[in-house]
């Protein structure tokens, strides 16, 4: 089902181009899109796959975690991703424990992260496993995926964020088109079933 949300994201890209930086909260427009059944899980797995593809140079335990994530996520359907739940839970816990170091700050506890892409995989798996009905978590995952630190602005949507938002827009267009195709096929099958019943 086609929506206007992707166009709203493209306007954010234009705004970044014009102003240099916009607030991460602009991505809250995604919450409405995530309310549609199945979209949030599909998005979470898509982000996890993108994160695995962007792993960069890694070695040791981090490289092993990336390999396990790639194996788990390979072949999952774009619209209705079904992954091995038990393996996903084990991997999620290993990812969480791998970067489980915190420091105290005046704003509270801050997690120390050395491999951001592994955190994105962890968050994506958590949504797919336990929070597929939480559009707020979907928005936060999108913000974590798109955010960029620039010393002029701090953390926000700037520079490379434009490319990542564009990737999300392409994902949304693809998923909406696949949803439409699936609905058409189901409608066609139902029509054939009804016709068969009438003939009987």
Predicted segments, located by residue:
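Structured binding/interaction patches within domain cores
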Residues: 2-200
